[in-house]
Amino acid sequence: MNRWKIDTVLALFREAGEIALRYYDDPPLEIKADHTPVTQADREIEALFAARFDRPAEALYLIGEETVDRRDEAYISAALAGECFVVDPIDGTAPYAAGVPLWGISLGYMRGGVLTEGAICLPVRDEAFLTCRGSIFRARRVLSGAPEVEPFMPEPMRYTPAAPVCAAQNAARGWEISFPNQLFVWSTCVGVYDCLLRGKVYGMIQHCKLWDLAGGMPLLKLAGFEARGADGRELGLDVVSGGNFYLENGPHRWRQKDYVVIAPDRQGTEAIWNQVKAKNLS
């Protein structure tokens, strides 16, 4: 059974967006053991998605940033082998907590360990992008309850020395980066994916966890973007057998094994890799 439906996703995004915006001006904030922030909005939004998708009795599972550590190994194995939604309730919690509108909500859909569909929602702009059966759609007025949905044609940015490139925190802090492009460090995947799809930034140096990319990577792949490591290895949508994620129990679980560069084509990924001296690639 394929339980990915545009109406269902957008209805959940409407409720999730309302929660996020309700707390946006002054979100209750805590710092987790891994030194990353979590807000009350993160927890309430994940509970919303869990109520809809955490149904193991129906062979439907949820991997969520804020609750996955409570799952036992039997649940995780079933989720990775079967039908599973992957949610990041607020991707970009740091900018969200600071009142910077570079955050969003990420939802991916896996079957048999492969990401087959994805969606991202930008509540501040009241907009979402989602895949459905080989097409990309853009939804406006999501929070109205009567979204305007239409096919979307991505507009990747053409390369120029002025084209912005986004980078993961550790890359920006520790790598030698010699390209002339403006470098943005936004602490969000959804915010960057949105800008890649709309041609506002050229590329991205990415190193993140499964839930950070689960909503956006199916969109980027369908749009023709490349995501490759320093050795040219592709980051695909096969989470389990692709070998690109740490999936065993341990401190790195759910993280990409290697950094990748995302760009509109392979030439773009190689151009960025050729202008950095990377350290600690995994």
Regions found by a protein language model. Give the residues of each.
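N-terminal subdomain of lithium-sensitive/metallo-dependent phosphomonoesterases centered on the IMPase/IPPase/PAP
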Residues: 1-90, 274-282
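Residue-level signal for inorganic ion chemistry
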Residues: 16, 20, 42, 53, ...
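DPxDG-like acidic metal-binding loop motif
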Residues: 75-140
